[in-house]
Amino acid sequence: MTFLFSTLQLSLFSLALVIFGYIFLRKQLSRCEVDSSTIPEPLGALPLFGHLHLLRGKKLLCKKLAAMSQKHGPIFSLKLGFYRLVVASDPKTVKDCFTTNDLATATRPNIAFGRYVGYNNASLTLAPYGDYWRELRKIVTVHLFSNHSIEMLGHIRSSEVNTLIKHLYKGNGGTSIVKIDMLFEFLTFNIILRKMVGKRIGFGEVNSDEWRYKEALKHCEYLAVIPMIGDVIPWLGWLDFAKNSQMKRLFKELDSVNTKWLHEHLKKRSRNEKDQERTIMDLLLDILPEDIVISGHVRDVIVKATILALTLTGSDSTSITLTWAVSLLLNNPAALEAAQEEIDNSVGKGRWIEESDIQNLKYLQAIVKETHRLYPPAPLTGIREAREDCFVGGYRVEKGTRLLVNIWKLHRDPKIWPDPKTFKPERFMEDKSQCEKSNFEYIPFGSGRRSCPGVNLGLRVVHFVLARLLQGFELHKVSDEPLDMAEGPGLALPKINPVEVVVMPRLDPKLYSLL
């Protein structure tokens, strides 16, 4: 009897063990199924704040996110306050973002920078997706940055580049040392500002309205990437008091100058006066009726917000690209020599290179592409927000989730780019597929509806300035040490340290006198 009882106990225990094991296994499998549809994320999320503490420190955000990608994969998420941020950094996931889900993720979150500096989100780059953004984007792409419009303003580019060359020549043809990054800064600002409102400043000029505008824009470049508590935990926005005050002061400075320029244009129009150079502000005033109101934004606000957005995104990014390109060439003299040899063989030394010659300079184009690969104009895309539930990289992304692409990581992925940290323009000549944007391996200006509308203009300026500089001058470092290539914080990944260059004319003096 005892034996039977013990046997029954053992059988019941075994049955219970089997049932428990079955239930446990089902739960584990169910958990695995849930986890397989959940985007990976780092451990250590804090109550309320989530992963915000992981973004602290001096290390650049693009590099912090790249390190997380190495650990968690090409798509991962961070819990930031009340919101979830999805970060993508491989071609397949990026393609999902910018093709299949381009419309679903086309809007922008409502952030402090857009409210305080972007004319309450009237700026093209920060406006939410909707009727207003679509109408403004159409105006900008069709009327301001079409190939015809860019061609019509070619004389401005030529004039400003000539001014730079004459400044470098110094009139005596001797060797001189210049801070080339500062000269690029003034050059590109003048090109953009003349296109926008017909204004310019001299090299080194200070205290004018135009100079104040330029300096305020530089501060904006930095403030735009500073994390704000209120952007992820709205009811703690009061903690951003100091930063918000900075933004408001900057906006007051920018808007006062913008308003002055607008009034000057309106006054000339009322008198039927015409400037020699037709500006983008003129075009906007032609297109937009005086009484127009789109999504609560009146004409004057739309005009000023557009001028600010295009100047902010177009000036510094171009000068920074030129600075990186020259720095890379100085550290790689063989590439510099090859570029000059190509120019000499294609154009010669008897005339100045023109924009129409650039199409024949394949190595120069490769230098610009490689510069954009290593130092993209924006290392991170602007943050998007999902307008509806969608699937990205095989994972479900809920409405309201924020997304960005780490272009810096994408462009340095060793699975895509052999020896990714090395400056090698030849890679764009050896493998044509590397520069095909449709591959989503190389997207220096972003992609989709929210990509940079001024990409063609920016590329023209970079190629033309670099070609003229290399044609007209021998360039050398001031010492035998390699240039420090440390990047700083900002929208456009600026170079931290200035670049001093020894310049020496390499053409017939008569050519410089013709400019």
Swiss-Prot record:
GO terms for molecular function: (3E)-4,8-dimethyl-1,3,7-nonatriene synthase activity; 4,8,12-trimethyltrideca-1,3,7,11-tetraene synthase activity; DMNT synthase activity; heme binding; iron ion binding. Induction: By wounding, upon insect feeding, by the fungal elicitor alamethicin and infection with the bacterial pathogen Pseudomonas syringae DC3000. Induced by the biosynthetic intermediate 8-hydroxy-7-keto-d-cadinene (C234), especially in synergy with the bacterial pathogen P.syringae pv. maculicola (Psm). Its cofactor is heme. Belongs to the cytochrome P450 family. It comes from the Eukaryota. It is a single-pass membrane protein. It is found in: Membrane. Pfam families: p450 (PF00067). InterPro entries: Cyt_P450, Cyt_P450_CS, Cyt_P450_E_grp-I, Cyt_P450_sf, Plant_Cytochrome_P450_Monoox. GO terms for cellular component: membrane. It comes from Arabidopsis thaliana (Mouse-ear cress). Expressed in stems, flower peduncles, receptacle of developing and mature flowers and in stigma of mature opening flower buds. One of its GO terms (biological process) is terpenoid biosynthetic process. Its EC number is 1.14.14.59, 1.14.14.58. Heme binds at C452. This is Dimethylnonatriene synthase. Its main location: membrane. It catalyses: (3S,6E)-nerolidol + reduced [NADPH--hemoprotein reductase] + O2 = (3E)-4,8-dimethylnona-1,3,7-triene + but-3-en-2-one + oxidized [NADPH--hemoprotein reductase] + 2 H2O + H(+); (6E,10E)-geranyllinalool + reduced [NADPH--hemoprotein reductase] + O2 = (3E,7E)-4,8,12-trimethyltrideca 1,3,7,11-tetraene + but-3-en-2-one + oxidized [NADPH--hemoprotein reductase] + 2 H2O + H(+). Keywords: Heme, Iron, Isopeptide bond, Membrane, Metal-binding, Monooxygenase, Oxidoreductase, Plant defense, Transmembrane, Transmembrane helix, Ubl conjugation. Disruption phenotype: No visible phenotype under normal growth conditions, but loss of TMTT production after alamethicin elicitation. Enhanced susceptibility to the fungus Alternaria brassicae. Increased oviposition rate of the phloem-feeding insect cabbage whitefly (Aleyrodes proletella). Substrate binds at H219. It is an enzyme of class 1 (oxidoreductase). The chain crosses the membrane at residues 3-23. Pathway: Secondary metabolite biosynthesis; terpenoid biosynthesis. There is a cross-link at K252 (Glycyl lysine isopeptide (Lys-Gly) (interchain with G-Cter in ubiquitin)). Involved in the biosynthesis of homoterpenes, attractants of herbivores parasitoids and predators (e.g. predatory mites and parasitoid wasps). Catalyzes the conversion of the C20 (E,E)-geranyllinalool to C16-homoterpene 4,8,12-trimethyltrideca-1,3,7,11-tetraene (TMTT) of the C15 (E)-nerolidol to C11-homoterpene (E)-4,8-dimethyl-1,3,7-nonatriene (DMNT); these volatile compounds are produced upon insect herbivore attack and emitted from flowers and vegetative tissues during herbivore feeding. Required during resistance responses to the fungus Alternaria brassicae.
